[in-house]
Amino acid sequence: MCSKEHAFNKSVLPSQQIRELLRKKQIFSNLNFEEDQIQPSSIDLRLGSKAWRMRASFLPGIQRKVSSCISEFAMQEIDLSNGYILEKGSVYLVKLQENLNLPENIEGIANAKSSTGRLDLFTRLISDYCDEFDRVIKGYSGPLYAEI
């Protein structure tokens, strides 16, 4: 379960441990990672080429995968490989390039880069079996999505 398991004494992984997760394919992508994606205590996630315009914002909850919710809430599938202009006031779901296969003792927290706020965008991370935005459960294995 995603919520109600958080403690306030969690630590942050330094870039060396993030690189180790990449080396062990516990964070992986079909494309090569760029060195500038790895920050002192975080990794920048990248949008993939597949997106959906959604009826509304949603969370899959602790029983469902995001992919099973897409057919229920998607209005349009979008290919982002040649660019796309997002409509203001609409909700989009974008599959990220990065996937996870985390060890049982590691969970994730996401927050948007400040540049997204300056562009007047509101983004949140969504993962399978989670009832909170911007959280990834311990030992999570699967894809990641951004809600825009």
Task: Explain the meaning of each model-derived region.
Residues 1-148:
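Non-catalytic terminal segments and appended small domains
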